[in-house]
Swiss-Prot record, chains A, B:
GO terms for biological process: gamma-aminobutyric acid catabolic process. This is Probable 4-aminobutyrate aminotransferase, mitochondrial. GO terms for molecular function: (S)-3-amino-2-methylpropionate transaminase activity; 4-aminobutyrate:2-oxoglutarate transaminase activity; pyridoxal phosphate binding. Its main location: mitochondrion. Keywords: Aminotransferase, Mitochondrion, Neurotransmitter degradation, Pyridoxal phosphate, Transferase, Transit peptide. The modification N6-(pyridoxal phosphate)lysine is found at K341. The lineage of its organism: Eukaryota, Metazoa, Ecdysozoa, Nematoda, Chromadorea. It is found in: Mitochondrion matrix. It catalyses: 4-aminobutanoate + 2-oxoglutarate = succinate semialdehyde + L-glutamate; (S)-3-amino-2-methylpropanoate + 2-oxoglutarate = 2-methyl-3-oxopropanoate + L-glutamate. It comes from Caenorhabditis elegans.
């Protein structure tokens, strides 16, 4: 392995006094409505050249720090939404800012490799530190991609390639397959399907939308593959008071999975893979039990179906484990685990049996982005050094307790408080009341967000501590009273 | 608009003496076989954690500069392949290295926005300088995405959304559409298709593979949408000696387009969009004439079909125009133009009629990467300042002339020399001979690459000058003689 070029401490020193914020405020400070006049003016400018329909407010990223996002008007909000759960260490973490000064990051940025063909000399080293060191149990091989959607797309392609190879007795494509695929005829272009679940979200490409059932606005007007969708458990909370009901949910859903595998087989459209989130996040924070997922593992093993766990939103530590599926105690590991968001780079881990033997089948120009891998390498180091997963577990336990208490005192406005670690949600009676609550919370200095039809979700980063928790619940309480 | 934070000249000064190369060698220097012993050792390391089937050699990106790529073993090659045509200004361009020092780039890197909801204060400014300033005639609105594939996917989604709105008299989705799409039933999930062309390459997601016909290994074992593929012209060269033959190609291909539009309409699977490359690059550098593309524009206008030009490989100036479709002189602009690679960020320009009115329909967490936009802003400034498109046109004219002469003197080894600007190709009698030539050229210090079944392609960056051209043809001549 070649040595890394030394960091220049002079660069860091200069950077340290630059215009990037380097400390958290002691609390939120709000001086305008949100969006304020500057955010509104920027949105008008932006609308001339780019869609703005989903823009909430513009952010001053130079002034944001830690758990606090600062908007264009100088309002500082405690952020428990963190760019849709995609910041592992909050804003402008000093260790990441330092990495940004290093020559190997700069060259990664300005001389971007086609890494499937011409990787950087430090690529394997980066993969080992950033990803192999946090690999899910049983899955050492990894492939980087640019985002969660491309991770899922390529995981599914890998599953199809494996499934077809199994049909050929383990062999690669023969002349007949290679010829027929150019006309999209069998056997080269097979009928194969992927099973998703009601409420699932796996991305917005046409393939991923075919297994996504989060919201109509995500899917309407877009053609889709005719792939099976099975039921996903809908538990009642608290769990310990609804054991029988919830167990029946698991059984019904697993029976539905089995039935649809058979149905699609009869329709000559075999299920090659099942893709599932540990917690259906965009769809409304719906949880599955370890027993449910163990059932899925057993069914997929029995039928020779690739079992893909989509940890794009759950991976990275906020659930109190680096992977949300860690606590399932499966009899054997999932075949693939996909990731993105908090892990900065997209990608997937896979079992060695799925490694594609032929070149250029899982391939594209960039196959990820080495700048993200270098940042992740440092982020993982910080997460381990500072015990941030343990912190999420501890602060998360307190979060769950407090959320339950808030619900109990809400006079029926809140329901179904649930979560793992700091990854948490609670339901409102309606979507409109939830939306009103989010707006009011933002104006009170707490940046939270919705998911599903009427859920409020919490997605703080890993630098969220007890002090931020206390402030969060003060602001939630205040907002609830003002609703 | 808020002012950008000032650059620190001290940072730049420090950076200038760092370990990043800042000058080109006078010519190639080769001291080992390629891949050499260090590249081979790195590949072995990499293979433990990541697929390596397509890896040619490892690159020392800190030592690479301008038109020269330096491999792990210290070999310096003149690079006319440039990371599969994705470097606009070669390696480690000093102006881009400077941008990497700026606080707004660093915060973009370490505090990445969910830019559809919380954009940076300088986002509209960056869009205007980086993209609007080079917008294709008639298309001012733009959407950034992460890569060429996601650009094409979202362009196609936009086309579907528009096509369905037209069917509803310009209206958004109603309750029936919203409800039915969750079960993937009509009318919410329509039967709609996209037309591609024989030899096309638009990316490797399942949707894009359905309109891709580059090579069997890209498509085999992957399920696909049943979408129409029309014939694409296959011209004979030189063009001025094959006018009648080539004109007939255009006519036959356009008739095929018309016939397949009708056929898919009869099958209740309307063609909502046609996607086409100006030059089919991965498929083997196949060109269409201005008359062919004018015919496509006329047909799509007549049928109310969205006309998408995929400039992922051609966009950015190497053809002697910023957009390869600039010289078609269409009666009206394309409806959409997609881009990536040399433009550093993915994305697409679109006509205002295609702007999606409802929020969260064209959306995802990141929707691009602001670091790439900031780099592109500087790259566009350099391209204009240094007259690099004009340079590509001039050097390109000489390149075409010399390639024709090389072919004439090749004793039948080369055929079909063709190109625009420095974007050029030539054919070998077989794929195996082409592959042998590429290997030998690399060992002689010229990094070129293949495309299609038996073509050699040239993809220098925009900093390629007459001096590099002379060296290129010396090396081509030497390699051809050694073949």
């Amino acid at each position: 392995m070649l040595p890394r070029l030394a960091k220049s401490s002079l660069i860091q020193q200069v950077r340290g006094v630059s215009a990037i914020a380097n400390a958290e405020p002691s609390g939120p400070s709000i001086s305008t409505s949100i969006p304020g006049p500057k955010s509104k003016a920027l949105k008008q400018e932006m609308d001339k050249v780019h869609q703005t329909t989903s823009v909430r407010f513009h952010v001053d990223y130079e002034k944001s720090f830690g758990n606090y996002v600062v908007d264009a008007d100088g309002n500082a909000l405690l952020d428990v939404y963190t760019q849709i759960s995609s910041l592992p260490l909050g804003y402008n973490h000093p260790d990441l800012v330092k990495v940004a000064s290093q020559p190997h990051l700069i060259t990664s940025l300005v001389s971007r490799p086609a890494l499937g063909s011409f990787p950087r000399t430090d690529f394997a080293d980066g993969i080992s530190h950033a990803l192999t060191s946090i690999a899910p149990k049983g899955l050492k091989a990894v492939q980087t991609m640019l985002c969660g959607t491309s991770a899922n797309e390529n995981a599914i392609k890998t599953a199809f390639i494996w499934y077809q190879a199994q049909r050929r007795g383990g062999l690669g494509p023969d002349a007949l397959h290679l010829e027929s695929c150019m006309n999209q005829q069998k056997p080269g272009t097979p009928n194969l399907s992927v099973m998703g679940f009601e409420g699932a979200f796996h991305g917005r490409s046409l393939c991923m939308l075919s297994v996504t059932r989060s919201k109509p606005i995500h899917k309407v007007d877009i053609p889709a593959f005719d792939w099976p969708i099975a039921k996903f458990p809908r538990y009642k909370y608290p769990l310990d008071q609804n054991v029988a009901y919830n167990k029946k949910q698991d059984q019904e859903c697993l029976a539905d999975v089995e039935a649809k595998i058979s149905e699609w087989k009869r329709r000559d459209n075999d299920v090659a893979a099942i893709i599932v989130e540990p917690i259906q996040a965009e769809g409304g924070d719906h949880y599955g039990s370890p027993a449910f997922f163990q059932g899925l593992r057993d069914i997929t093993s029995k039928h020779g179906i690739v079992f893909i766990v989509d940890e794009v939103q759950t991976g990275g530590g906020a659930t109190g484990d680096i992977w949300a599926h860690d606590h399932w105690n499966l009899s054997s590991p999932p075949d693939m685990v996909t990731f993105s968001k908090k892990l900065l780079t997209g990608g997937y881990f896979y079992g060695e049996h799925l490694r594609v033997k032929e070149a250029y089948r899982i391939y594209n120009t960039w196959m990820g982005d080495p700048t993200k891998l270098l940042l992740l390498e440092k982020a993982v180091e910080v997460i381990k050094r500072d015990g941030l997963i343990e912190q999420s577990r501890e602060v998360g336990a307190e979060f769950q307790k407090r959320l339950g208490e808030l619900q109990a005192s809400s006079g029926g406005k809140l329901d179904q408080a649930r979560g793992r670690g700091t990854f948490a949600a609670v339901d409102f009676p309606s979507g409109s009341l939830r939306d009103k609550f989010v707006d009011l919370a933002i104006s009170n200095g707490l940046h939270c967000g919705g998911c599903g039809d009427r859920s409020l979700r919490f997605r703080p980063s890993l630098v969220y501590t007890k002090k931020h928790l206390d402030l969060t619940f003060d602001l939630l309480d205040k907002t609830l009273k003002g609703l």
